[in-house]
Amino acid sequence: MQAASAFATCLLASVGGNSSAVAFPNQANYSTLVAPYNFDLLTTPSAIVWPQDTQQVAAAVKCAVDSDIKVQPKSGGHNYGNYGSTTGELSVNLDNLQHFSMDETSWTARLGPGNRLGRVTELMYNNGGRHVPHGTTFTVGLGGHATVGGAGAASRMHGLLLDYVEEVEVVLANSSIVRASKSHNEDLFFAVRGAASSVGIVTDFSIRTEPVPVSSVTYSYIWEGTDPAARAEVFLTWQSLLAGGSLPQHMAYDLVATANSMILGGAYFGSQEDFEAFNLSSHFKVAPDVAHIKTYTNFFDFSAAASAQTKAAGIASPSHFYAKSLVFNQQTLIPDDAAEEVFKYLATTKNGTDLYAVTFAALGGAVRDVSASETAFYHRDASYFMFSFGRTSGDLTDTTVQFLDGLSEVLTSGQPDAYYGQYVGNVDPRQSTDKALTGYYGKNLHRLQQIKSAVDPNDVFHNQQSIPPLS
């Protein structure tokens, strides 16, 4: 540990004198402990602390405030801007807060933010055969995922993970510990479900659960080739089927464009017979070159396979990369001519990557059953998310940044003046704060600033795209 300072002494005391639970920049292994997710945005927090419980989180926050140091929490550490380890700020690593219990009367789970999604899936499955909608990557932390949205395979059927959060325990900027729900500290509860890192640190979640599906069918259909017209045809059919309303709500339905293929994949929560009766591939004019269908009766096995597939795709691990997101609704669907321009762009523009993927992830369904003003997550009318991702073997170049920035421009060229939201779970730290906040929070931004002003007027919980208090 570095030479004693008031901040260092206080931080060490906050964790009961456990020197292994704090780290400072002069330590030889500090960059390893920071563990950046995006290698192109290396950061140096003023210190890292690993508290054991809520009281230690609160004590660490007080140390930072007393030394005029800002704070960000970190659970799984998958933030695309490394915001959980912001330079010059205290990184509160929540890895030790992994408690879990299940009330088998209400089927409500109590969980700590340090739990990873893989552990959440396994514990819920083994304690009553339960689950909640969430993303497929098992290494993602609950603390961030449950407070930005939490979309995943079951979201069209059940909604977002944050929609299942019933109550939270939060450490505020004044180091007080409060609980929030729909009936208590309602404004804070609104903000936590979509923008928690700007208002406090969630140390405990109460999450209602659903029974696991009896049968889960995974499917993938692959069209090989690079012809822009053929690729646009697959995309437009995918978009039309989603927009037309005939797609079963209990179906996850994603389309991924890579350099050489179009991959339609997802899950159907029901029997394989019912899935085959829907005959998804028959809706496309050209039959896919490859088809894979598999049925799982063990929901954890299904979830583990989905996580392994995401990992194998190479888009969910620490690396050099750049990524962007866009939200499309029924009013901003991509028109035919713009779709062909998108795939011409992909075919002809230098990308500078060793891997890129453009994912169109279907939403709608139960996500729309919650109003845009009920939680900080604004994009309830979304038909689908677009996630673009470019990975490089070394330092990111302007070529890759310009490739993905240009792709977003082409994707929105059909209605360039329309509002296109963005997903705060996939931050783009290269854009301006104003553009980012408008994209993430839409018309909820002003209310969020009011709440920020009330609970954190001095902007203790801060990163480069956090919500500022009203000036």
Swiss-Prot record:
Residues making up the signal peptide according to the UniProt record? 1-23
FAD-binding PCMH-type domain location: 41-212
Q: Which residues are glycosylated?
A: N18, N29, N174, N279, N351
- Copy the pathway line from the protein's UniProt record: Secondary metabolite biosynthesis
Cited InterPro entries = BBE, FAD-bd_PCMH, FAD-bd_PCMH-like_sf, FAD-bd_PCMH_sub2, FAD-linked_Oxidoreductase, Oxid_FAD_bind_N
What EC number(s) would the UniProt record show? 1.1.1.-
Highest taxon above the source species: Eukaryota
Q: Read off the Pfam families from this record.
A: BBE, FAD_binding_4
As cofactor, the record names:
FAD
Without the gene, what phenotype results? Leads to the accumulation of sorbicillinol and impairs the production of oxosorbicillinol.
Write the record's keywords in alphabetical order, separated by commas: FAD, Flavoprotein, Glycoprotein, Oxidoreductase, Signal
Q: Could you tell me one molecular function GO term of this UniProt entry?
A: FAD binding
The record's similarity note reads: Belongs to the oxygen-dependent FAD-linked oxidoreductase family.
What role is this protein assigned?
FAD-linked oxidoreductase; part of the gene cluster that mediates the biosynthesis of sorbicillinoids, a diverse group of yellow secondary metabolites that restrict growth of competing pathogenic fungi but not of bacteria. Sorbicillinoids biosynthesis requires the action of two PKSs. SorA iteratively combines three acetyl units and the growing chain is modified by the ketoacyl reductase subunit, and optional by the enoyl reductase subunit in the second cycle. The polyketide is then handed over to the PKS SorB, which adds three more acetyl units, and two methyl groups.
Protein name as annotated: FAD-linked oxidoreductase sorD
